[in-house]
From Swiss-Prot:
This is Exodeoxyribonuclease 7 large subunit. The lineage of its organism: Bacteria, Bacillati, Bacillota, Bacilli, Lactobacillales. It holds the Pfam family Exonuc_VII_L. GO terms for cellular component: cytoplasm; exodeoxyribonuclease VII complex. The gene is xseA. It comes from Lactobacillus delbrueckii subsp. bulgaricus (strain ATCC 11842 / DSM 20081 / BCRC 10696 / JCM 1002 / NBRC 13953 / NCIMB 11778 / NCTC 12712 / WDCM 00102 / Lb 14). It comes from the Bacteria. Its main location: cytoplasm.
């Protein structure tokens, strides 16, 4: 009381009294660390600030302050009416002369606290899509290497290796040992998965798990950092945590959940004898299908060999051969006309020469005659060459128009179900059966869609 000074020896100011009471509270060793339980009341979350609420039981209530730095460490979302454990100190607020509890930590009360943390984290991660079905990846059919994260001393790794070797001995099993229980288990599990992630290209699938236990024993597999690491793995993950009735957040984030380690190994590996039997069945079906295709193609080839075109191919050339004969006859007649015309000209020149008789004229006419003779010869030769070229072109066209040669160049022609040649899309409707004639056989198909193209 030495520091208390009032305007009168007998009277204290309000501030002096509140200060004195605060000193009493702050110096009391029993009030410096108090473990308190109660029900949250008047709780309204203040984002980014200090939290002010009350704790109550059936008979009493106390005001509580939790500063931002301490509240940020709380691992669950407090809700109105929730029973909690808090630790802190008791002191007064001088400005109002009231005492209140200053909370340093808070957690849900009892075993229900873990269930509440589980529920809240499950809801949070589900909203982020970590458990969404569209993110689940299929397991590889034939894994070369399988990574396993579990205890090195438990029965889990033994069951996995025995089952995998029995079903698919080709697969290599690599153990990444980790603690699966206790306060440091979550960090150990994450560290093991990060080692696998660094070598992700080596492993086809990951199995993570442990044997059965209580909720507290299995809790590391519900920690947020473990669940997020499972979701982030680059290879498919099989989770096998606890018994079949146990469900952890790790199970929900994994691509597949197995009830037991043995079931996890069965998911990760194929049953080799069954696979070999299925391959044998597929081989038999494939051979049957191949034989059927060969038989159909052989029948088509036989039909082609017995067709009109193959038996009498010369009939394809008959009309073209007649055209060649006609062109040859026309060429001969033209040659006769040209020769006759030039002969008449020569006769006229000769007659004129006989009438004129002078040597100079005769010489000139001889030169003209020589020139005309050469011109005639060159003209005849040129006409012959042109007609011969036309004849060769006609023969070549005749050969080009051969259906066999057209088919040999990769073309085909199409007939409908009645055997009529299809020349326009207007002859067809979707669903019609058509036959494609190729150089080495026929193919039967069905019209799916018709697209008409207009040529300008």
């Amino acid at each position: 009381m030495d520091s208390i000074k009032g305007t009168d020896e007998k009277y204290l100011t309000v501030s002096e009294l509140n200060w004195y009471v605060k000193q009493k509270f702050d110096r009391d060793p029993y009030l410096r660390q108090i473990f308190l339980q109660g029900e949250l009341s008047n709780f309204r979350f203040r984002r980014g600030g200090h939290q002010y609420f009350s704790l109550k039981d059936d008979k009493s209530k106390i005001n509580v302050v939790m500063f931002r730095g301490d509240f940020d460490k709380v691992k669950f979302e407090p809700e109105e009416g929730m029973k909690v454990y808090v630790t802190g100190r008791l002191s007064t607020y001088e400005a109002q002369g009231s005492y209140q509890f200053y909370a340093k930590s808070m957690e849900p009360a009892g075993l229900g606290a873990l269930y509440e943390r589980f529920r809240q984290l499950q809801e949070k991660l589900a909203k982020e899509g970590l458990f969404a079905q569209e993110h689940k990846r299929p397991l590889p059919l034939f894994p070369d290497k399988i990574a396993v994260v579990t205890s090195a001393s438990g029965a889990v790794i033994h069951d996995i290796m025995v089952t995998a070797n029995r079903r698919f001995s080709h697969a290599e099993i690599d153990l990444f040992p980790a603690q699966v229980q206790g306060e440091s288990a979550a960090g150990s599990l994450v560290s093991a998965m990060q080692q696998i992630q660094a070598r992700a290209d080596e492993y086809d699938v990951l199995i993570i798990g442990r044997g059965g236990g209580s909720l507290e024993d299995l809790w590391p597999f519900n920690e947020e950092e473990v669940v997020r690491q499972v979701y982030a793995m680059k290879m498919p993950v099989i989770s096998s945590v606890g018994h079949e009735t146990d469900t952890t957040l790790c199970d929900l984030a994994a691509d597949c959940r197995a009830a037991t380690p043995t079931a996890a190994a069965e998911m990760a590996t194929p049953a080799l004898p069954l696979v070999l039997a299925e391959i044998g069945q597929l081989q038999t079906r494939l051979l049957t299908d191949i034989r059927a295709v060969i038989q159909v193609r052989a029948q088509a080839l036989a039909q082609l060999e017995n067709s009109f075109i193959m038996k009498e191919p010369q009939r394809l050339y008959e009309q073209k051969m007649q055209q060649v004969d006609q062109l040859s006859q026309q060429l001969s007649r033209m040659m006769e006309v040209i020769v006759k015309d030039q002969g008449q000209k020569l006769s006229l020149l000769t007659q004129r020469l006989q009438h004129q008789a002078p040597d100079r004229r005769i010489k000139q006419l001889k030169q003209e005659n020589s020139y005309l003779a050469k011109s005639l010869e060159m003209g005849i030769k040129r006409i012959l060459e042109q007609k011969q070229a036309a004849c060769r072109q006609a023969v070549q066209q005749l050969d080009d128009y051969s259906p066999l040669k057209t088919l040999a160049r990769g073309y085909s022609y199409t007939t409908d179900a009645s055997g009529n040649v299809v020349k326009s899309v207007q002859q067809l409707v979707p669903g019609d059966q058509v036959r494609l004639h190729l150089k080495d056989g026929q193919a039967i198909g069905r019209i799916e869609e018709i697209k008409e193209e207009k040529n300008d």
